[in-house]
Amino acid sequence: MIQYKILYVDEVESERNRFLRYIHKNDDEKEFLTEALEPDAELEKFLEKILNDNYDAIITDHKLSEANPLIQYDGLELVEAILKSRIDFPCFVLTSFDDDAVRDGDDVNIVYIKGLMTNEEGHLAKFIYKIKNQIKHHRKKIEKAKIELEELIKKEYLDALDEARLLELDTYIEKTTNVKISIPPQLKSLSNLSELHKMIDNTEQLLANIREKKDVK
């Protein structure tokens, strides 16, 4: 049963087919729906296309312009653009042994050597398992954030820390799921309004205490 939809990006058709064969061969439980695309020349155009397709993970070759000089970005730049739109999104960059992606990349944990996929016999953690685990970890973080957000929404009263956390969770969910409005605008307004009423009540109580002291005199 399909559980994960993933994308592989490479400018070379034979490499795209190679990756598709790798997933097909190693997907023992048939959980992966795998697509492979040639990158567009312009990053923004390609980014819009792939982010609208709701992939669970994106894997890309590093040197995307090696066989097609019209492509204006490499795999690391593609991943960087993806992560700006979807924080913590599962991304992987595949490189050759003589590649400089590890040196150039900010996060070495997303960079893997292509050769690992052809020599995995006896390995405890195949690359396909790394993809699966990253997706599961990402989904778990989002679900945990949603549960915490729902618990905050159900509270009758939110203090300043609760409100700050609520907005933090809302922003996180928006940037990981591409849901632009996680909390209805009116609920956010009510939350702010409750803080305003709290300030008014505190001010009124302070004024009442001052009046009482004056009356005693």
Where are the regions that the model predicts?
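A general structural motif
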Residues: M1-Q3, N54-Y55, D88
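Conserved acidic segment of CheY-like receiver
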Residues: I2-H24
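Output/docking surface of receiver
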Residues: D10-V12, E35-A36, L70, F92-E168, ...
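A short acidic (Asp/Glu
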Residues: R16-L20, K45-F46, N68-I71, V102-D106
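Short hydrophobic/Thr-rich beta-strand motif most characteristic of the beta2 strand and flanking loop
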Residues: E29-A41
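Conserved phosphotransfer microenvironments
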Residues: E42-N52, D56-L83
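His-Asp phosphorelay/catalytic-motif detector in bacterial-type signaling
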Residues: A81-C91
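C-terminal output/effector regions of signal-responsive regulators
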Residues: K136-K217
